[in-house]
Amino acid sequence: KDGYLVGNDGCKYSCFTRPGTYCANECSRVKGKDGYCYAWMACYCYSMPNWVKTWNRATNRCGR
């Protein structure tokens, strides 16, 4: 599946101040095929296994 990686706090992985390879590395860590820093704000990953938690507007709990 594709989507934004989320941490234990339910927030998207921020990449604003990270090196250019940060998101690709984080995505491969969870067995994703590739990833990038979307609009310099959050890591978006491709071809991840279904067990990986991704951000969803309906179930968003970041900051709550």
From Swiss-Prot:
UniProt cross-references to Pfam families, sorted A to Z: Toxin_3
Compartments where located: Secreted
Organism: Tityus discrepans (Venezuelan scorpion)
Covalent S-S links between cysteines: C11-C62, C15-C37, C23-C43, C27-C45
Domain notes: Has the structural arrangement of an alpha-helix connected to antiparallel beta-sheets by disulfide bonds (CS-alpha/beta).
One GO cellular component term noted in the UniProt record for this chain: extracellular region
GO-annotated molecular function: sodium channel inhibitor activity; toxin activity
The protein's name: Bactridin-2
SUPFAM superfamilies attached to this UniProt entry: Scorpion toxin-like (SSF57095)
PROSITE patterns: LCN_CSAB
Role, per record: Shows antibacterial activity against both Gram-positive bacteria (B.subtilis, M.luteus, E.faecalis) and Gram-negative bacteria (P.aeruginosa, Y.enterocolitica, A.calcoaceticus). Modifies membrane sodium permeability on Y.enterocolitica. Is toxic to mice, but is not to crabs. Induces concentration dependent haemolysis in human erythrocytes. Acts by inhibiting the sodium (Nav) currents.
Gene Ontology biological process terms from the UniProt entry: defense response to bacterium; killing of cells of another organism
Tissue expr: Expressed by the venom gland.
Domain of life: Eukaryota
Keywords from the named record: Antibiotic, Antimicrobial, Cytolysis, Disulfide bond, Hemolysis, Ion channel impairing toxin, Neurotoxin, Secreted, Toxin, Voltage-gated sodium channel impairing toxin
Protein family: Belongs to the long (4 C-C) scorpion toxin superfamily. Sodium channel inhibitor family. Beta subfamily.
Gene3D superfamilies in UniProt: Knottin, scorpion toxin-like (3.30.30.10)
Domain LCN-type CS-alpha/beta, first and last residues per copy: 1-63
Xref: InterPro entries: LCN-type_CS_alpha_beta_dom, Scorpion_toxin-like, Scorpion_toxin-like_sf, Scorpion_toxinL, Scorpion_toxinL/defensin
